[in-house]
């Protein structure tokens, strides 16, 4: 599968129009819309694209969520151009922007945190398959993950890139730093990394959400996430085949 991905990637990148602003805007909008739907939200594509093109949300909660996702990605684009390191402050800033208009203060048995400020969750969070990281360990686990990923990407070629970002996404979702929007935050972060390294955006299709969630549940934290890596490769092959 990796060789198919590399072959299609090269064919896609050699197309004359892939570097045009029109095509880049199209890919960006597709990426954001699929990410929005993966987060469990839904809007007609025309309304979503109108929010992105005008920068103006409507009065509903769903359109505000779309606007916030768009603003969070704009922030990622600007920081990628500045070569912003992947660190705790940046991760929190991305999450805060995603939750800016729909987040708020949450109270648990151990304290309060504000999702609109990018606060880390307080309190245990258990999934039906595996327990997620102890909330007291979130800063250390996430800091180590960010540092490791940054170092690995500076030394990686195209062949290793997908494995590295898949590992980041997998461990990020097992740490589950935030009370909400972890999936959207994780997807924006791996694409921030791709943008910074001048790789094509990773398009994960909402129609394959069940497969994505299943891939994220395979194994334990810090294990090599082969299932997720294969899923991301499959999604990119699917995208390239659509475009070539």
Task: Locate each region found by the language model.
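FIC/Doc superfamily catalytic core
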Residues: 1-244
């Amino acid at each position: 599968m990796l060789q198919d991905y590399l072959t299609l990637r090269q064919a896609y990148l050699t197309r004359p129009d892939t570097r045009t602003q029109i095509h880049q805007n199209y890919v960006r909008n597709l990426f954001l819309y699929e990410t929005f739907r993966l987060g469990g939200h839904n809007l007609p594509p025309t309304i979503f694209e109108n929010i992105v093109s005008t920068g103006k949300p409507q009065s509903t909660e769903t359109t505000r969520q779309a606007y916030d996702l768009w603003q969070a990605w704009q922030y990622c684009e600007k920081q990628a151009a500045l070569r912003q390191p992947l660190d705790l402050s940046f991760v929190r800033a991305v999450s805060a922007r995603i939750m800016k208009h729909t987040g708020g203060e949450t109270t648990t048995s151990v304290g309060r945190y504000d999702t609109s400020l990018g606060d880390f969750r307080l309190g245990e969070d258990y999934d039906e398959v595996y327990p997620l990281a102890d909330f007291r360990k979130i800063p250390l686990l996430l800091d180590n993950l960010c540092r490791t990923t940054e170092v690995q990407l500076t030394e990686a070629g195209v062949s290793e890139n997908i494995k590295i970002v898949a590992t980041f996404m997998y461990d990020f979702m097992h740490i589950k730093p935030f009370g909400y929007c972890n999936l959207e935050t994780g997807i924006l972060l791996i694409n921030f990394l791709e943008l910074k390294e001048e790789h094509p955006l990773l398009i994960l299709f909402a129609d394959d959400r069940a497969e994505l969630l299943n891939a994220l549940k395979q194994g334990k934290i810090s294990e090599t996430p082969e299932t997720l890596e294969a899923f991301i490769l499959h999604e990119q092959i699917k995208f390239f085949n659509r475009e070539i």
